[in-house]
Amino acid sequence: MATHNVHSCEFEVFGRVQGVNFRRHALRKAKTLGLRGWCMNSSRGTVKGYIEGRPAEMDVMKEWLRTTGSPLSSIEKVEFSSQRERDRYGYANFHIKPDPHENRPVHEGLGSSSSHHDSN
C-alpha cells in the first residue's frame, strides 16, 4: 500500500504529567486517531514522544496535548520539534516506551484491569 501525506513531529509536555496516567491517555487518544509513534516519561519530569499520521489527525492530537491530557494532569506547555513530511510510516502503531527511571514493565494494552497501579 502506498503511503503519502504522512507528517511527523516530536513533542515534550511540561507540567504535572507524570503519575497522572498521562501516557495511558495519550496512547488511547493516538490510537483513536490512527496515529503511530510513542511516548515516555523523561527523567526531567516531562512526557516526551513522537507522533506520525495524517495532518488533520496530527492537529487534533497536538491540540489534545496542549489542552486536555489526562483528567489529573496540569499542562503548562508543550514543545513540538522536528516537524516534517514523510514518505512512509516509521512505526506500526503507537506505544508507551518503558520509563527510564523505573524498573518495572509498562502495560500497553487498553482496558487492562490488572494495571491500575501504573504511575504514568
UniProtKB/Swiss-Prot annotation:
UniProt KW Hydrolase keyword: yes
Domain Acylphosphatase-like: 8-98
Active-site residues, record numbering mapped to chain: 23, 41
Keywords: Acetylation, Cytoplasm, Hydrolase
Catalytic activity, EC: 3.6.1.7
Enzyme class, broadest EC rank: hydrolase
Alphabetical list of PROSITE patterns matching this protein: ACYLPHOSPHATASE_1, ACYLPHOSPHATASE_2, ACYLPHOSPHATASE_3
Biophysicochemical property: pH dependence: Optimum pH is 5.3-6.3.
SUPFAM superfamilies, per database record: Acylphosphatase/BLUF domain-like (SSF54975)
Catalysed reaction, written as an equation: an acyl phosphate + H2O = a carboxylate + phosphate + H(+)
Subcellular location: Cytoplasm
Modified residues (N-acetylalanine): 2
A Pfam family assignment: Acylphosphatase
Origin superkingdom: Eukaryota
Principal location listed in the UniProt entry: cytoplasm
GO CC, one annotated term: cytoplasm
GO molecular function list: acylphosphatase activity
Designated name of the protein: Acylphosphatase-1
Species of provenance: Drosophila melanogaster
Gene name linked to the record: Acyp
